[in-house]
């Protein structure tokens, strides 16, 4: 079943088409460090983009981080994601792994990634290999370092804005003197720290030589893209993003820009920036050498788009983010499940439940949570196969727990349907219940069909065994352990037919 694009997706696609139409056969201008006006343009139009050159990062940290990347790669911990874009399943050219606070998730392109926990104080995590444990510890150390650097950069930016000056450098080399930025009141200081409170890092890997096809950058003619133009999703508003880049060539092999070459050097990895939907301001293509870091501060991620332009060597990156986790942690979804199940009075040995209330608002909330845990958590997790077991078993017990709570919610739905069908229920009460639940049951049926089809798709069948999508929860029609069938078509049709006078379209 093809998903209908959201209004936001349709608007974004329309903007893209309009921009391409305006361009016709011409390229927009962009600048590289070879251009005289490059740094001036960066300062004027991209002041919230900061580059820390590799020489300004401690050498021992470089060594640890680069070893950690290679260790995770050796253990097969990077995975290409089967993502959903405008109703189509696509395999990302970049392989990824999410590391971060225990129980956190990060959602992008309709895909929820689950953290391999880094070893924060008070948490106990069992890793499959000692090398994986050491790597997670290293990325926590890098996170702490980048957090300090980000706070410094945000303070510099705030001072610049307060003083109304343009003196803050956008590119900082190893000899740049780090000076105190003066005083901030408590609220300003807290705000800056919160905007740098990275709770996850999304690690990326790509070897361009093993990718038979990469898209060409469509607006500026910048060459092959590893990652298309985008805003990073699912972040706390105005929070920073910090990126550590590691391309695998040795320092002696790094290519210097050829002054005779027009545009960016295609052998070198770059990050591209442009102001969203602006065809007047030149874009930037910033070369990324081994160990360089860049920072997107304040609202830059909202007002600008960025892309990653492929070079020749394999490249890793660690992208540190303040993920918007208000609805994306294990604690959150467990609390939601408990809220839904507060309406259960008793549960019999055979799984039948009795409910405390048939108030429509209570039933609607329960069915909403039922859908949330099934489609935002269980199916998202199992769609990624057994990939997380390569690193840790941290999510195994929580997923078993969530599945048990979800199964109780199946019993709740069954109890609601029994009430709807019970003789003697006043027509008005029956209609109120149906108005509360039928749209949610219809959504559940449609999404189950969609997820089942995604798991069976041709592209899903090409994945390695440990990454093959699993349609879970799934059960056959005559499974005695389940109160309701997997396929709700007949139930939805029955309810619609029996109560067809209700305004279901609403």
Curated annotation (Swiss-Prot):
Gene3D superfamilies from the UniProt entry: Alpha-ketoglutarate-dependent dioxygenase AlkB-like, FTO C-terminal domain
One Gene Ontology biological process: DNA alkylation repair
Stretches for region Fe2OG dioxygenase domain: 32-326
Location(s), subcellular: Nucleus; Nucleus speckle; Cytoplasm
Residues reported to bind Fe cation: 230, 232, 306
InterPro entries according to UniProt: AlkB-like_sf, FTO, FTO_C, FTO_C_sf, FTO_cat_dom
Binding-site residues for substrate, renumbered to this chain: 96, 108, 230-233
Cofactor: Fe(2+)
SMART domains cross-referenced by the UniProt entry: FTO_NTD
Catalysed reactions listed for this entry: a 5'-end (N(7)-methyl 5'-triphosphoguanosine)-(N(6),2'-O-dimethyladenosine) in mRNA + 2-oxoglutarate + O2 = a 5'-end (N(7)-methyl 5'-triphosphoguanosine)-(2'-O-methyladenosine) in mRNA + formaldehyde + succinate + CO2; an N(6)-methyladenosine in mRNA + 2-oxoglutarate + O2 = an adenosine in mRNA + formaldehyde + succinate + CO2; N(6)-methyladenosine in U6 snRNA + 2-oxoglutarate + O2 = adenosine in U6 snRNA + formaldehyde + succinate + CO2; a 5'-end (N(7)-methyl 5'-triphosphoguanosine)-(N(6),2'-O-dimethyladenosine) in U6 snRNA + 2-oxoglutarate + O2 = a 5'-end (N(7)-methyl 5'-triphosphoguanosine)-(2'-O-methyladenosine) in U6 snRNA + formaldehyde + succinate + CO2
Residues binding 2-oxoglutarate, per UniProt: 204, 294, 315-317, 319, 321
Free-text cofactor note: Binds 1 Fe(2+) ion per subunit.
Residues carrying Phosphothreonine: 4
Keywords: Acetylation, Cytoplasm, Dioxygenase, Iron, Metal-binding, Nucleus, Oxidoreductase, Phosphoprotein, Transferase
Positions of the UniProt region annotated as Loop L1: 212-223
GO CC terms: cytoplasm; nuclear speck
Principal place of residence: nucleus
Functional summary from the UniProt entry: RNA demethylase that mediates oxidative demethylation of different RNA species, such as mRNAs, tRNAs and snRNAs, and acts as a regulator of fat mass, adipogenesis and energy homeostasis. Specifically demethylates N(6)-methyladenosine (m6A) RNA, the most prevalent internal modification of messenger RNA (mRNA) in higher eukaryotes. M6A demethylation by FTO affects mRNA expression and stability. Also able to demethylate m6A in U6 small nuclear RNA (snRNA).
Family that this chain belongs to: Belongs to the fto family.
Domain remarks: The 3D-structure of the Fe2OG dioxygenase domain is similar to that of the Fe2OG dioxygenase domain found in the bacterial DNA repair dioxygenase alkB and its mammalian orthologs, but sequence similarity is very low. As a consequence, the domain is not detected by protein signature databases.
Stored PANTHER family: ALPHA-KETOGLUTARATE-DEPENDENT DIOXYGENASE FTO (PTHR31291:SF2)
Protein name in UniProt: Alpha-ketoglutarate-dependent dioxygenase FTO
